[in-house]
């Protein structure tokens, strides 16, 4: 009722000034009949009215007012309506599957009304009466189109395979949709990854990020240059406005400051791309982890001998450097109750099972024992510098041996202390698990690691400070967590457990991280 009181105060104050009344389509009157506000009805979500009045946009609790006028909704037969726009990658299968599961969990029947492949509507109804409760419309194109639809007032949620751009965030602010860069404006529905793919009979098993960029810039034109046969390289890529292509340009080509070759063959869908690559032993394409078809993924190779394969675990932990979170963005306005319930459902275990079932990577938190991390420990010993003595490695193993690593990991944006998008989502994910008592009676250790640049002792201190900062970020979100319910400790091992070589920005970025261990 706070907004209602504010609205009534504004109305009372303005009426006292004798402001002229305008022709409006609804009038909302308090239950005692003492105060009325007229305006153009913007939305009604089944609970709250939002009107454009002479005092600006006001939101009023429907339980405290009566509505009169031609614009008043049917309160008894109200049907919540909202539209989801954006990436076909997410909208073709993933979101429909999630809506079907949501309807089942909510004991509602579901009907799909199709206009065409990109435009369709789901109608959720009560099973006993058949009365429609909600209509969820879809406008599928790509991430760019989804944000454009939201700016134009044609969408309430945006499906995005990349983060919002500065230009889009600025336009959203101008449109009074809120700050799209803030965590509250987006959530990660699931995970995917940018992967390079080749035909099954291509002998190349791994390629460095630098060579991958040079391949797609046309600087490497023969497979022989990267250990393959003496044959020309044929390049395949998705359409330039696809989220996948944009991610590749930012994370791979942008880091190398290279331009894409004009000889790249473009494809409208990932299925078409992997099919073309699988049939050509001399082709290489950029696809998604979730779209492999008959092609074979190529691992990323580090200069110091470490390879990074895209797996469900490495995408969850971001140990694979080209992880691709799947975002759902919402504006800073109140959505219908059914929409809010659907958003809450997306964080449930049931939703994450759906994400995995349809081929994407879920965010269910797993535990990895140290016995399954032999390669990491071997790398730590092999790459340990002079400033990482044996006793420090022994201390690390002693601390971590009785614990298990969670697949929740925290990494930072390039050249910044700000957590990257997936890690910001992990803050909320871990906080919700803590509040739910998921780790009750156990100890969580936030363990910081660094790259190998600079003094080792200083790096250990920096790593420990990062671990403390991440712990604070998580506990600030987990507002219902009582300190007595769980032990949350911090530790810093600096450069003692490298995940990648320090000879590149992306390698150093992988090494600068905070892991979470539980025992």
Give the location of each predicted region.
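N-terminal hydrophobic targeting signals that begin at the initiator methionine
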Residues: 1-2
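Bacterial N-terminal signal peptides
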Residues: 5-18
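Signal peptide processing junction and immediate N-terminal pro/mature segment
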Residues: 20-22
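Exported/periplasmic ABC-transporter solute-binding proteins
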Residues: 25-439, 464, 468, 472, ...
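Periplasmic OmpA-like peptidoglycan-binding domain that tethers envelope proteins to the cell wall
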Residues: 140, 145, 449-519
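Short loop/turn segments at strand-loop or loop-helix junctions that form parts
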Residues: 412-413, 446-451
